[in-house]
Structures are given as C-alpha cells and as structure tokens.
Amino acid sequence: MDQSIADLRKNYTLTGLTEAEANPNPFVQFRLWFNQALEAQFLEPNAMTIATVTPDGKPSARMVLLKDFDERGFVFYTNYDSAKGQQLAQTPWAALVFWWDALERQVRIEGTVEKVSQEESDAYFASRPWESRLGAWVSDQSRVIESREVLENRLQALKDKYQAQDVPRPPHWGGFRVMPEKIEFWQGRPNRLHDRLCYKWIEGEKWIIERLSP
C-alpha cells in the first residue's frame, strides 16, 4: 500500500540550539556544524541549493557544491555562461540552503555575489581530475543539445587533443563568492517548535543574533 505523503513526518529530538551555545561569529558556527556534518559521513555534506533570480523576476534553484568558505563568504564554481551565471551577472544576489537531515539541521544564507579572482579559479581548476577539466570545455551548460553523443564526441576530441597534458581553465568557467548579509541556523526540535537563530550583519559594525519563531 502506498503511504500517504501527508502522513510523512518525523519528530526532531536530537538536540537544541541556544544563544548561549551559539558562537557570536556565524562563520565559526558554520564551521562547527559543517565539521559535524563531515563526521556524520554524509554523502556530500557540501551540497547546497543556490537560488537565483531570472530576468523576469522568477526564482530559479539548483544544487551545487560548496568548495571553500571563510569570512569573505561561500564559494562555488560553475560555467559563467550557464543560466545561473547569467542570472548572477544581472542580479548579483543569491540564497543558499544546506540540509543535513541526520543532524536535523538546516543553514540558510542570503547575500550579494561576486566572482572570485582568476588566481582562485585557476588554483581550484588545476586541482580537479583531468577529465573533469575537459568536461568544463565540453559542456555549453544550460544549452539545448541533440543527444548525449554530442557530449561524448566532444570529450573524445579533447582527449585526443590534450592526451593527458595540462588542460587550461576555460575563460567562461570560474568561481562565485556569496557574501552573506544573513545566516540562519535551524535546529529541529520536538513538536515543530524548532530553534532558529539568525545572524544579521549590521553594516560597518558587527553581527547580531536574533531568535526567530518557528
């Protein structure tokens, strides 16, 4: 018998999150939670949803992988000519969501977006597996193609061209940094009375922490 979707639910009971426990620096708090997600052996603990805005104001979301973070912001890499790349070029704002279900935790981040330096993009690109570097040249991301054979033929042609030699970074491929103005830490609690601590940046001053109603 198929289970009713309406009946799918879980009561969150693992732990709580208080203002006294939370680090006053949201990046330190994020690192703490991220390290705990690593220890919990999630398949991809750095997977995150990124939401952007289309030219006509419609939301657009997809999963990407976090590749670095520090107090400047949260970094991911992509094709600058992709749909999200073009959307960020026009409207440089984004929202990120991390969901670590086994820990009953969610992190939401909102902020402005900028490209990382060419040096940062070069360094990360050079660290990727050889065929992944070729893949950055193969894919005209978000464009319509006739079949998968188009990709496979392009990949083989590039393998023949480079033959395990160094592959340069495409000029249309690199990193974005989301520079947060708001970071919310959500911890599931019993009876849907979850803990929500929201860090907000007061321009030129400091981070403040506010508790939000669930």
Curated annotation (Swiss-Prot):
PROSITE patterns annotated for this entry? PYRIDOX_OXIDASE
Cofactor (UniProt):
FMN
Q: GO BP, one example?
A: pyridoxine biosynthetic process
Which residues hold substrate? R9, K10, N11, Y12, K67, Y124, R128, S132, R192, L193, H194
The pathway where this protein functions is: Cofactor metabolism; pyridoxal 5'-phosphate salvage; pyridoxal 5'-phosphate from pyridoxamine 5'-phosphate: step 1/1; Cofactor metabolism; pyridoxal 5'-phosphate salvage; pyridoxal 5'-phosphate from pyridoxine 5'-phosphate: step 1/1
For the keyword Oxidoreductase, the answer is: yes
Give its E.C. classification number. Answer: 1.4.3.5
Q: Which SUPFAM superfamilies match?
A: FMN-binding split barrel
An annotated Gene Ontology molecular function:
FMN binding
Cofactor: binding comment: Binds 1 FMN per subunit.
**What InterPro entries does the record point to?**
Pyridox_Oxase (IPR000659), Pyridox_Oxase_CS (IPR019740), Pyridox_Oxase_N (IPR011576), Pyridoxamine_oxidase_dimer_C (IPR019576), Split_barrel_FMN-bd (IPR012349)
Query: What catalytic activity does the UniProt entry give for this protein?
Result: pyridoxamine 5'-phosphate + O2 + H2O = pyridoxal 5'-phosphate + H2O2 + NH4(+); pyridoxine 5'-phosphate + O2 = pyridoxal 5'-phosphate + H2O2
Pfam families (UniProt xref): PNP_phzG_C (PF10590), PNPOx_N (PF01243)
Q: Which UniProt keywords apply?
A: Flavoprotein, FMN, Oxidoreductase, Pyridoxine biosynthesis
Residues binding FMN: R62, M63, V64, L65, L66, K67, Y77, T78, K84, Q106, Q141, S142, W186, R196
Q: Which PANTHER family match?
A: PYRIDOXINE-5'-PHOSPHATE OXIDASE, PYRIDOXINE-5-PHOSPHATE OXIDASE
- Please give the function described in this protein's UniProt entry: Catalyzes the oxidation of either pyridoxine 5'-phosphate (PNP) or pyridoxamine 5'-phosphate (PMP) into pyridoxal 5'-phosphate (PLP).
Which family would the database say this protein is a member of? Answer: Belongs to the pyridoxamine 5'-phosphate oxidase family.
The record's subunit annotation is: Homodimer.
- What name does this protein carry? Pyridoxine/pyridoxamine 5'-phosphate oxidase
The organism's taxonomic lineage, starting at the top:
Bacteria, Bacillati, Cyanobacteriota, Cyanophyceae, Oscillatoriophycideae
Primary gene name: pdxH
